[in-house]
Regions:
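Conserved catalytic cores of very large enzyme subunits
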Residues: 1-169
């Protein structure tokens, strides 16, 4: 039994292990919805560099885990928001140690920092500069974020690395 994680790197490691367990025992893909919003409380107090390092390790790990049937990568997806969507702002924010610590609206900066770090990791690619195979990156396009600064960054990333998916919400 693992206690609830207290740090972002531990949370992302557990999510990666969950992907691997899913891929080894079940068929079909696995996804985490609003990934950056739910992870945001764990990024509180981190610098951008620390946050990006955690995200990069998570994505690299997802591309090294040949544990699915036939020694394949786990078919996995991350659903990403540009910020905390309106419908989540008043929800209790579960954070380090499994403790409710405010509302998700208290973690807008952290959710956006995770999105920005992820976009940078996607743009940089792997150690050879090639696109990451998994997880699939699915960005939620919501009217409330159409003019968000990270929307422009997403388009720059897609121009270089056309692997992210866009979901019109």
């Amino acid at each position: 039994y693992a206690k609830p994680p207290k740090h972002l790197d531990t949370l992302l490691s557990l999510l990666s292990e969950n992907f691997m367990a899913h891929g080894g025992f079940l068929s079909g893909g696995a996804a985490y919805n609003q990934w950056n919003v739910y992870a945001a409380p764990f990024a509180k107090g981190l610098t951008y560099s620390e946050c990006k390092q955690c995200v990069q390790a998570f994505i690299f790990d997802a591309n090294q885990s040949l544990v699915s049937k036939g020694g394949q990568l786990v078919f996995s997806s991350l659903n990403i928001e540009f910020s905390v969507p309106e419908f989540m702002k008043d929800l209790d924010a579960w954070g380090p140690g499994g403790v409710i610590n405010g509302k998700y609206s208290d973690y807008i900066n952290e959710a956006e920092m995770l999105t920005e770090a992820l976009l940078e990791v996607i743009e940089e690619g792997d150690g050879h500069g090639k696109a990451h195979t998994f997880p699939n990156f699915i960005f939620a396009l919501r009217r409330e974020f159409i003019d968000h600064p990270l929307m422009k960054k997403l388009h720059q990333v897609i121009a270089k690395c056309p692997t992210p998916y866009l979901a019109n919400m």
